[in-house]
Every structure is written in C-alpha cells, then in structure tokens.
Amino acid sequence: MDLLGAHVSIAGGIHNAVDRGVSSGCGVIQIFTQNSNQWKGKAVSPADAQLFRDKLTASGLSHVVSHDIYLINLAAAPGEVKDKSLIAFKEEMQRCAALGIDKIVMHPGSHTGDGEETGIRRICEAFDQLFAEVPEFTGKVLLENTAGQGTNLGYRFDHLKSIIEGSSYPTRFGVCFDTCHAFASGYPIADRDGYRRTFDEFDSALGIDKLMAFHLNDSKKGLGCKVDRHEHIGAGALGLEPFRFILNDPHFKLVPKFIETPKGDADEMDVVNLKLLRSLVEG
C-alpha cells in the first residue's frame, strides 16, 4: 500500500482533489474542504459528496484526511473568534461526515496571552461540545504538533497529552506529527540519536499508537527556531536522514504521510519530492 502523498487543491470542485492527487503520484491525499482563508464554507451537496466518493473509490487512493482552516482558534477566550471557530469546526465535521473523511488534522490554537493551562482547558471544552453536537462525524481529530510561534499551543507533546486526557472523548483523538514543526520547536530529529529520543518521549507521553499521520516537510530554519517555514525535502535544515528514519521505521509502516512542501507550477514539485521520498525506502 502506497501511503505517501500530498496536500492537494480543491479548486474547481472538491472532487478535483482526487484527480490532482492521482496525477501527482499520490497514494494518499490531504485537503481543505473549503477555502482555508474564509470563515464560512459551503455545505457539500449530496451530488458533490457522491461524486467525490465515487472518484475516490475508483482512484486507488487509500486515505484522505482533511485539514481545518487556519482561522480556527478553539483556545480563544469567549467572544467572536471563539464563536466563529466553533461554528467553522462544526461545519468541518459535517462536511467530512458527508464526504466519508474520517480524520481531521488541526492546529490546537493560541492562548493569546491567557496562559497555556487556560488555552488547553478551552480546547477540551470546545471538543466536548463539538463531539456531542456532531454525532454524524464518527472519526478522529488529529492534533498537529506546532512550531512554537507566539502563544500557539501544541509545540510540546505534553500539550497534546493534556488536551486528549482533558477531554471527555479521549478515544476520538490522534496526532499528526509534522517534521518541520517538531524540529522548529526543538525536537532534534535530524540525527539518529535525537530521532530515537524524540519518539521515545512521544511514546512515553502519548503512546506511539496515537501517531496516525505525518506531515513530511523540511525546515527552512534551524533547530529550535520557533519559525514555521516549510522547505523541499532534503533542501532545508533537516536534510534527508530524518525522512529516511521515518520511512523505514516499522512503527510507522502503516501511517499515512503527506508533504506540504512548496508546489511550484502545476504541482510539479510534489512529483519531485514524492519521488525523492520513495527513493529513501529500503528493501
């Protein structure tokens, strides 16, 4: 099973994402289900949902995950941003249920100066509300580790653990591990020893079975920079070795892996980056 793929565009209709993934050589795809820079997304019509499902079945793609829009901040204080965030994530869950997508990747959010403990509590409360309000979404939310910019939460594994354990629905969560974000937040995954120590820490905090997706991105900046800037595979500060480690780690053999690297014209760089990653697989 090919578990390497990319984030692909839904321009022209959500079903077009399937075609773009196939043409780029993806075995799996990640999508936004709406415009990522707008609060309000369109509901998916039954016809559009069926077309997406039919194309997906015919495509041979083994996994599709959604990524929530960047505007959402479930750690926000009560007010307009929090209200809009709850509505937007609820609509995301509803669209994914209609499309048959069972995993939503999301950035935990920013406490905006109110403190990490407060922000984490707000996230837990938000998800308790959302899971109860959208029973038709029976899948999982994958919390993505972050680079540690500003007051963003999720840059340490214990943040993710606290969200999962603080929710009334702990089994509804997994983790999406972003290599660029991990490195930028201070996890030394670029060498073998640091890689082992990082995933030992992950296993101790969360359990390795909670890791349900990877974002494979190189980093433009160095270890601990707290800057989220993705680079082509092998062209940044990470180099090729951490990707080789992940792709040949038996723990992650069945975990889907998505690139979010610069696209180039007509997505041709997705083809280049995926080809390079596949060349690192041993045996």
From Swiss-Prot:
Zn(2+) 3 binds at residues 181, 228, 230. PROSITE patterns: AP_NUCLEASE_F2_1, AP_NUCLEASE_F2_2, AP_NUCLEASE_F2_3, AP_NUCLEASE_F2_4. It comes from the Bacteria. GO terms for molecular function: deoxyribonuclease IV (phage-T4-induced) activity; DNA binding; DNA-(apurinic or apyrimidinic site) endonuclease activity; phosphoric diester hydrolase activity; zinc ion binding. Keywords: DNA damage, DNA repair, Endonuclease, Hydrolase, Metal-binding, Nuclease, Zinc. GO terms for biological process: base-excision repair. Binds 3 Zn(2+) ions. Disulfide bonds: none annotated. It is an enzyme of class 3 (hydrolase). Its EC number is 3.1.21.2. It holds the Pfam family AP_endonuc_2. Its cofactor is Zn(2+). Zn(2+) 1 binds at residues 67, 107, 144. It catalyses: Endonucleolytic cleavage to 5'-phosphooligonucleotide end-products. Zn(2+) 2 binds at residues 144, 178, 215, 260. PANTHER family: APURINIC-APYRIMIDINIC ENDONUCLEASE, ENDONUCLEASE IV ENDODEOXYRIBONUCLEASE IV. Belongs to the AP endonuclease 2 family. Endonuclease IV plays a role in DNA repair. It cleaves phosphodiester bonds at apurinic or apyrimidinic (AP) sites, generating a 3'-hydroxyl group and a 5'-terminal sugar phosphate. This is Probable endonuclease 4. It comes from Citrifermentans bemidjiense (strain ATCC BAA-1014 / DSM 16622 / JCM 12645 / Bem) (Geobacter bemidjiensis). The lineage of its organism: Bacteria, Pseudomonadati, Thermodesulfobacteriota, Desulfuromonadia, Geobacterales. The gene is nfo.
